[in-house]
Amino acid sequence: METELNNKNDKFKYLKITTVICLIALVLSFAGCGASGSSGSSGSTGAAKSAGSTIIKGSENIKPISVSSFFKNVGKNTGIYKMIHNPTPEEIAEEKASKEAMEIAKEEQTAQAAADLAKHPVKGWQRLIMLAIGFLIVYLAVVKGFEPLLRIPIGFGTILVNIPGAGMGDGPDGMLHIIYNAGVGNEFFPMLIFMGIGAMTDFGPLIANPKMALLGGAAQLGVFATLFGVAAMNFIPGIDYNMKQACAIAIIGGADGPTSIYVSGKLAPEMMAVIAVAAYSYMALVPMIQPPIMKLLTSKKERQIKMNQLRPVSKTEKTLFPLLLLVVTILLLPPAAPLIGMLAFGNFIKEVGIVQRLSKTVENELMNIVSILLSLGVGSQMTPEKIMHANSLGIIVLGLLAFAVATAGGLIMAKIMNLFLKEKINPLIGSAGVSAVPMAARVANKVGMAEDPTNFLLMHAMGPNVAGVIGTAIAAGVFISTYGM
């Protein structure tokens, strides 16, 4: 009885915290809308929403293609094609022009942001609100235990960058500006984080039951389905996303903070701070978000399904797995190789067993140092001109949608697999297909044990959980190869 009461109190506590966060985002979005409306931009926004305009900016440049053309283009983006095909002078010139155009676009975006800031300087009350948000993030991390290892430095970064006159986020000598340029804005820190994740990850459950990779892949439904949510959100006055921003928001559905930072840094750096905070917030809220969806989509009988113990996995299998994973990625999806490559490297030095000093350093000291710097760099982007906008509220809503659909995708795939499998799998482990390791696996185990205290699903759920890490990295590679290359 006391346990049930504590669970209810925890759920009520999480609900209150989530409500507070949404209300703050709502206030900030209206403040941003009011500021933009007073500057006379409402007319342009209305024009953008006209019936003749496209739903997502940038999609008007995407020409319809046939199925055969689609697969032909996919084939040209594989590592196999690039290794055996000698590029023509026209292709080299086109690639060079594309890179130059991207650099010009970045410079124009930076110049436009500086011009907007000069035209509409940050007001004192806006800095005060951002300071309050920074302290709120620290409070949630310390008192409520919401991802404290990351949220504390993010909160302090938010506080430090918004101190009037301190200049910690100003270039070229501000400390937070240096941290951001050194590792956050150029993907260096997220790569190191993935190396650390690899050193801490055990792929044994996935190797023992490779079918679980399907559940990790199905959970990416939330990532791609969110693109439709972005299209719908663009009908709301004051919200206006382009295709790159849509992809950066959608990756929140993978429940992977480093990947969200990596993709947003590549495609939508102006939204990185909100996307990172949203991603880590929903990762912390896994015990609240997932169980209702799990119970809604499964029956009591399905939740009580017991699975056979996993077979032992040899050291040779564990050592070869990261190498095989890297080779497949190189051959089929090179844009995902940076993330997968660092994950494979970290896991290989752990499993090979002859460089324990390296693996322990990557897993502990290096991971901790980079986490601090990465989080401070993300916090340095929590400035009024980037946060106080209706798009910030949209990110919070769409992130929750992505996470919920990803959970549902894994559950539904598990139920579909049971139609063809002799040895049934418990659909609850499908919810662990999101890459919140190991939180999602623990939630699946907890919900299963609530139905049957003797039903231990943790190791089974770790299979789709680590597959979700790989799946999210692959989804990131698809987005970057499509819109960021």
Identify the residue ranges that each predicted region occupies.
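Structural signature of hydrophobic alpha-helical transmembrane segments
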Residues: 119-130, 178-193, 245-251, 334-344, ...
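Alpha-helical membrane segments and immediately flanking helix-loop junctions
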Residues: 181, 185-186, 195-200, 214-225, ...
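Alpha-helical transmembrane segments
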Residues: 270-288, 398-406, 429
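Entry/N-cap segments of selected transmembrane alpha helices
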Residues: 206-227, 384-410, 461-465
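Membrane-embedded hairpin module used as a gating/binding unit in multi-pass transport
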Residues: 278-354
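Low-complexity, proline/glycine-enriched hydrophobic segments characteristic of transmembrane helices
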Residues: 16, 30-123, 238
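Interfacial helix-loop-helix linkers and transmembrane-helix boundary segments
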Residues: 142-151, 170-180, 201-215, 355-364, ...
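Transmembrane helical segments that form the transport core of multi-pass membrane transport proteins
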Residues: 37, 93-96, 326-410
